[in-house]
Amino acid sequence: MPVEYLVDASALYALAAHYDKWIKHREKLAILHLTIYEAGNALWKEARLGRVDWAAASRHLKKVLSSFKVLEDPPLDEVLRVAVERGLTFYDASYAYVAESSGLVLVTQDRELLAKTKGAIDVETLLVRLAAQ
């Protein structure tokens, strides 16, 4: 089954809490290498603030991340072009570029990225779509 959705770090964080609702559709979901580091940084921050046990959270994150196909990194010049044209960060532009150039639906919780990426959806919409399949 082909990949249909590109999940950014904000969506990954939200999806981690709903593992049972999407895991059977994992072959439709992909991330970027960047997503791994962004998710790790969010985990680091939560651990530093004492909100999570880093070891347990790390095990869960590893399980979640291993469920996704990791896509190739996009051409940096194209990502920079999208970032400048749309007023996005380089990180966000990488998701927008890959989703649009690959015909994937971007899944994000970032309002600006939702507004500036053609066809982007949030996690709630993704879960509804997957449940209907």
Swiss-Prot record:
Homodimer, 2 of which then form a homotetramer. Inhibited by EDTA. GO terms for molecular function: exonuclease activity; magnesium ion binding; RNA nuclease activity. SUPFAM superfamilies: PIN domain-like (SSF88723). Its EC number is 3.1.-.-. It is an enzyme of class 3 (hydrolase). Mg(2+) binds at residues 8, 92, 110. Gene3D superfamilies: 5'-nuclease. Keywords: Exonuclease, Hydrolase, Magnesium, Metal-binding, Nuclease, Toxin-antitoxin system. Belongs to the PINc/VapC protein family. Toxic component of a type II toxin-antitoxin (TA) system. InterPro entries: PIN-like_dom_sf, PIN_dom, PIN_Pae0151-like, TypeII_TA_RNase_PINc/VapC, VapC_family. Residues 5-113 form the PINc domain. The gene is vapC9. The lineage of its organism: Archaea, Thermoproteota, Thermoprotei, Thermoproteales, Thermoproteaceae. This is Exonuclease VapC9. Its cofactor is Mg(2+).
